[in-house]
Amino acid sequence: MTLQESDKFATKAIHAGEHVDVHGSVIEPISLSTTFKQSSPANPIGTYEYSRSQNPNRENLERAVAALENAQYGLAFSSGSATTATILQSLPQGSHAVSIGDVYGGTHRYFTKVANAHGVETSFTNDLLNDLPQLIKENTKLVWIETPTNPTLKVTDIQKVADLIKKHAAGQDVILVVDNTFLSPYISNPLNFGADIVVHSATKYINGHSDVVLGVLATNNKPLYERLQFLQNAIGAIPSPFDAWLTHRGLKTLHLRVRQAALSANKIAEFLAADKENVVAVNYPGLKTHPNYDVVLKQHRDALGGGMISFRIKGGAEAASKFASSTRLFTLAESLGGIESLLEVPAVMTHGGIPKEAREASGVFDDLVRISVGIEDTDDLLEDIKQALKQATN
């Protein structure tokens, strides 16, 4: 079946990347073969030679992700971190990068512990729009943003960042990368606002079932795609056919899962924001009080805030730990974006490797709790939050 330009997101989610099977199977088979027959030397029968280079299941997933991000090209990797590593590996030695300070701990670790050892220097800022013109240098090759950020849910105007890069005298060779993991392609499409590459830890919302580790990227820049595709094959950090198949299956219900999680998260965030007795502050893009709500209205489908919330609890680190250990439906675990609700304390978990001073400068305090709202009943989740707050603050 050929998709039409008028087809909506749900239709694309179900049918993009659809396979053609000689047996007529409705759901694509899993192609586990590592190698493919050739009719004569260097003359493959089909389009595949060796599964590290390409595999039917991976290709179908890549095409599907590209379609949902309004992109021409997609690539899949063995993890979100492998996606990040491959992009940074594409930069010339001696390059400079700019990143928001409030970034996923694993990304911060790669910038500071790996990329710098290979000749890529990174400048971090907590005020990107104001600082970017001064931070871009002659050797700057990349700007990296998350929006919303992990875990404080700051929202960045992607178009403004893209415009700043274009206007800068040294901006012509700078690529803008946006990590869209927290929202998924259902809520936002960064390429529409000037990003050069959009990346996801597909482990999270795209797969959505907490049973696959996988990363993806999408782009409309052909030379950039060809360079990254070369590195994908050369480095070999690719997902297995089964993981690609599982992720593609999860993607088909993305719109249903993400919308439900976002609707529940909005109600939970409103409750937390009203609880002045137990809660210091709430970070959630769907709240009209969010400092960048005007950007949310522009960049997010239906002004949805997504399924991620963070909040500071009264009582400090001890209260945060007690709250995280007192929930019934929210499982204390790292990761996010699955059908089940999760929570964590970033200061000692996902962001524990970031120095305290840098962490707190980005708003990640010891009393911060991050929750990933799943698709359980909204009222049940609210009751769980209420009882855990009571236990933690009394």
UniProtKB/Swiss-Prot annotation:
It holds the Pfam family Cys_Met_Meta_PP. GO terms for biological process: cysteine biosynthetic process; cysteine biosynthetic process via cystathionine; positive regulation of hydrogen sulfide biosynthetic process; transsulfuration. It comes from the Eukaryota. Keywords: Amino-acid biosynthesis, Cysteine biosynthesis, Cytoplasm, Lyase, Phosphoprotein, Pyridoxal phosphate. PROSITE patterns: CYS_MET_METAB_PP. One of its GO terms (molecular function) is pyridoxal phosphate binding. It is found in: Cytoplasm. The keyword Zinc does not apply. The modification Phosphoserine is found at residue 362. Pathway: Amino-acid biosynthesis; L-cysteine biosynthesis; L-cysteine from L-homocysteine and L-serine: step 2/2. CDD domains: CGS_like. Present with 38300 molecules/cell in log phase SD medium. Catalyzes the production of cysteine from cystathionine in the reverse transsulfuration pathway for the biosynthesis of sulfur-containing amino acids cysteine and methionine. In this pathway, homocysteine sulfur is converted to cysteine sulfur. Also has cystathionine beta-lyase and cystathionine gamma-synthase activities in vitro. Cystathionine beta-lyase may be physiological, while cystathionine gamma-synthase activity is not, as the required substrate O-succinyl-L-homoserine(OSH) does not occur naturally in S.cerevisiae. Homotetramer. Belongs to the trans-sulfuration enzymes family. This is Cystathionine gamma-lyase. It comes from Saccharomyces cerevisiae (strain ATCC 204508 / S288c) (Baker's yeast).
